[in-house]
């Protein structure tokens, strides 16, 4: 009786699973199968084959795929695990179901197929990437969410942010530019007000200091997001805002696999501020003048248009004075022209009704606009500002593996047009990842990522306030071109006063080349030692070159040569970080221990030079290629060199008993040269506990439909070292304006005086975030339905901010630890595999999160 009730429960769960897929809108991924038709001289007679598919407990497997090998002929099992299929005699059937090993079985005429599927332990023990290692998902004590390859492949994202979008707890902004990869990322709320609150990025096990556009989404195998302090505390000073771990693809054993893909799309502007077309522009001027000139109190005491009077009680403007004569009859037009009130204007000799209408709207203040209006010439400034951009993303890769070597190579090219005219972005990306097993105890590997990208353009200005250049504020009766067919500098009037703005005229006098060349590398070696020990060395050097060449021609009409010329700048970054990791992993009966000790160091150096050349003679016609002729007193140059370091020591202990009770503890000590001399080191740690209650005896009756149920509890503390200028805790000397005469031994010298412009902050401490998390994880029907729920509370103290000082101190502010920020919230994620067979996959994902800051 009890078994039957469980069977009914399982059927109900399956029905609910299918209904969930219909209720929630989710893209459906269809795997296309090539169909090849061969001509045959004879046709074999098909026969009916039936059978029952069950699991190890004897329960029917619902929705298992049964496929005739080498064909697209297939079916799925019903609620009793039964199937019937017409096949060629002696053919082989492929039976598969998520969470179970795939089985091939040859048919025998007249014999039913009764098959018991065995669980696929590799799928049930899904591995996630955590700090400095991996863990089974079942063993996690912290809040970790994994974005698997199927989502990446199905959605074909164009940026890392697109991959992350939709993950519960993550807030991903939108970047409407052609680049499209500068969208902000926020995990579980804003942790800090005065410092950077973005999550730490880890690429293939090493901290990543570049921008996310350098990572090709097509190269990503999986992403793991460490949300709570327990899972992220291993990264200490850089993990207060969470950690996003990106793992790139590697080859699989077998023949080389070649993938080529193209992603073509268009971009259009979203809702933007309203602009006036020709009809709207006229109505605006009519309504504005009616309100400004004619609004007044009528005989009935009410206020309305055309009620304004002079001191004698005469109407200033009669009703309909600002009406468009083209909407009136011939008789009405004559009355409209002659009835002008006290302050109105009437027809001039030889003037048309339309001309009078234009004068009443004061278009005659701009003869150019007046002429265009009378002749019906208009410009659509919206089309001149926006466009439908065409985006191209091409990728190719080759990968493979042998028993000793694993390799993956890829190339990618992006050429994007933004929705704003002139907004463009292009980039070339390549990636090489290779690992080799030199001996049974030594493995080495390298990961080299290269990118060359443009990073600037001269796009149409949209302006941020009324005084900024913005073509959308031009009249539709303004002129794009002058009478000679050249771009008009002042499209509204032809004069600087109320002249409007024409991007295309100004663009002739500007040029820009700006971009980055980046090389990210990771080199590693791993030695397997006796007694469960292993040692791994990783080092990640990073090189970045930046160039910026900007030309502003002094030939721009009405421009000052002293303010025009060439800006040339370059910079170079060299960063490296390394770690030495010792891991001990040992199982004693029902006890599982994993211990990790890590020593880490990093260094960052930055150099830049900038030249601003002005008033170049005899001409700046050579653009940014010529600066020698600049006026030295009107030009300037600057340099900036930055150097900072960090070091860390950390450890993590994981213990599991019976794969049922888990404990994780971490401790990390971080040192950073950017902090005050009295507090360069910070200590961070965490504790996490989890209980797989589904393994308890009292849950044995639920094993038929529940794969796993787990309770998680965690507490931890993380730090934040990202507070801008790495020298802000040191005092600073600056050159004062002007000069002074200095006398020594009767001799005078003219010197530039120095003064202290910044007060030292030797007592600045680490910004710390403490977090508590409680979570539940569930898996049903062999992983076909999963659920994760988390409640968290985070509190940031000793926030690093600028504190104002009284004026008598001689300084405006000092860096200090001020204030607190608290975040608390709830997250839930539901994932289901509604249908999965050889030709069709239907997955559904639902996420919900709420955060209170």
Residue ranges of each PLM-predicted region?
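Short, small/polar-rich motifs associated with maturation and membrane association
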Residues: 1-417, 421-431, 438, 443-445, ...
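Acidic surface patches and DE-rich sequence motifs
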Residues: 55, 78, 310, 482, ...
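Short, surface-exposed charged micro-motifs
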Residues: 74, 84, 234, 397, ...
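Extracellular/periplasmic, surface-exposed regions of secreted and cell-surface proteins
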Residues: 152, 198, 427, 433-442, ...
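A surface-exposed, glycine/aromatic-enriched loop/edge motif typical of exported proteins
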Residues: 273, 278-362, 451-494, 601-622, ...
């Amino acid at each position: 009786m009890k078994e039957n009730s469980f069977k009914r429960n399982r059927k109900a769960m399956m029905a609910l699973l299918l209904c969930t897929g219909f209720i929630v809108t989710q893209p459906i991924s269809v795997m296309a199968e090539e169909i090849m038709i061969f001509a045959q001289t004879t046709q074999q007679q098909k026969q009916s084959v039936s059978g029952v598919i069950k699991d190890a407990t004897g329960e029917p497997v619902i929705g298992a795929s049964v496929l005739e090998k080498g064909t697209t002929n297939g079916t799925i099992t019903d609620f009793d695990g039964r199937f019937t299929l017409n096949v060629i005699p002696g053919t082989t059937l492929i039976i598969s179901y998520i969470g179970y090993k795939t089985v091939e079985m040859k048919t025998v005429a007249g014999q039913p197929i009764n098959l018991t599927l065995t669980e696929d332990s590799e799928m049930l023990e899904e591995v996630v990437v955590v700090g400095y290692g991996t863990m089974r998902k079942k063993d996690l004590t912290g809040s970790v969410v994994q974005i698997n390859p199927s989502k990446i492949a199905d959605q074909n994202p164009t940026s890392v942010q697109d991959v992350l979008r939709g993950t519960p707890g993550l807030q991903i902004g939108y970047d409407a530019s052609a680049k499209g990869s500068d969208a902000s990322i926020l995990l579980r709320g804003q942790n800090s007000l005065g410092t950077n609150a973005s999550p730490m990025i880890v690429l293939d096990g090493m901290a990543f200091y570049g921008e996310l556009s350098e990572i090709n989404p097509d190269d990503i195998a999986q992403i793991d997001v460490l949300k709570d302090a327990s899972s992220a505390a291993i990264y200490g000073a850089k993990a207060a805002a969470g950690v996003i771990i990106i793992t790139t693809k590697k080859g699989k054993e077998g023949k080389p696999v070649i993938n080529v893909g193209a992603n073509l799309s268009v971009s259009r502007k979203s809702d933007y501020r309203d602009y006036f077309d020709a009809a709207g522009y006229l109505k605006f001027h009519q309504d504005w003048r009616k309100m400004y000139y004619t609004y007044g109190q009528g005989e009935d005491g009410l206020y309305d248009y055309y009620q304004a009077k002079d001191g004698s009680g005469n109407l200033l403007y009669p009703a309909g004075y600002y009406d468009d004569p083209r909407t009136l009859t011939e008789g009405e037009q004559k009355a409209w022209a002659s009835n002008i009130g006290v302050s109105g204007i009437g027809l001039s000799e030889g003037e048309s009704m339309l001309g009078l209408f234009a004068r009443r709207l004061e278009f005659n203040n701009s003869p150019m606009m007046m002429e265009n209006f009378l002749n019906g010439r208009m410009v659509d400034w919206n089309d001149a500002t926006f466009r439908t951009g065409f985006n191209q993303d091409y990728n190719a890769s080759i990968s493979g593996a042998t028993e000793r070597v694993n390799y993956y190579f890829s190339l990618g090219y992006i050429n994007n047009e933004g929705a704003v005219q002139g907004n463009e972005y292009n980039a070339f990306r390549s990636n090489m990842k290779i690992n080799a097993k030199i001996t049974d105890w030594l493995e080495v590997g390298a990961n080299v990522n290269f990118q060359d990208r443009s990073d600037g353009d001269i796009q149409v200005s949209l302006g941020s306030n009324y005084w900024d250049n913005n073509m959308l504020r031009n009249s539709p009766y303004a002129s794009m071109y002058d009478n000679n067919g050249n771009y008009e500098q002042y499209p509204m009037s032809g004069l600087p006063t109320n002249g409007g703005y024409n991007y295309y005229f100004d663009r002739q006098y500007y040029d820009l080349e700006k971009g980055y060349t980046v090389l990210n590398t990771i080199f590693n070696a791993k030695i397997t030692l006796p007694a469960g020990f292993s040692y791994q060395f990783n080092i990640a050097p990073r090189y970045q070159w930046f160039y910026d060449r900007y030309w502003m021609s002094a030939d721009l009409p009405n421009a000052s040569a002293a303010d025009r010329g060439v800006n040339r700048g370059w910079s170079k970054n060299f960063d490296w970080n390394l770690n030495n990791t010792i891991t001990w992993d040992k199982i004693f009966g029902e006890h599982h221990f994993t211990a990790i000790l890590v020593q880490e160091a990093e260094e960052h150096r930055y150099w830049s030079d900038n030249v601003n050349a002005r008033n170049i003679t005899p001409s700046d016609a050579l653009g940014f290629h010529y600066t020698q002729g600049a006026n030295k007193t009107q030009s300037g140059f600057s340099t900036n060199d930055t150097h900072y370091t960090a070091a860390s020591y950390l450890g993590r202990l994981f213990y599991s008993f019976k794969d049922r009770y888990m404990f994780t503890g971490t401790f990390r000590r971080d040192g950073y040269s950017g902090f005050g001399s009295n507090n360069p080191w910070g200590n961070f740690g965490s504790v996490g506990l989890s209980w797989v209650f589904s393994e308890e005896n009292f849950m044995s009756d639920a094993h038929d439909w529940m794969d796993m149920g787990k309770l998680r509890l965690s507490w931890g503390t993380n730090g934040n070292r990202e507070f801008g200028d790495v020298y802000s805790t040191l005092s600073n000397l600056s050159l004062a304006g002007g000069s002074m005469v200095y006398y020594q031994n009767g001799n005078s010298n003219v010197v530039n005086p120095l003064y202290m412009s910044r007060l030292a902050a030797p007592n600045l401490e680490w910004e710390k975030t403490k977090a508590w998390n409680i979570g539940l994880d569930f898996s049903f029907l062999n992983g076909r339905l999963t659920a994760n729920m988390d409640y968290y509370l985070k509190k940031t103290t000793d926030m690093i901010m600028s504190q104002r000082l009284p004026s008598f101190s001689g300084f405006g502010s000092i860096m200090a630890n001020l204030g607190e920020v608290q975040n608390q919230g709830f997250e839930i994620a539901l994932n289901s595999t509604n249908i999965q067979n050889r030709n069709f996959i239907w997955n559904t994902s639902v996420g919900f999160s709420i955060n209170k800051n």
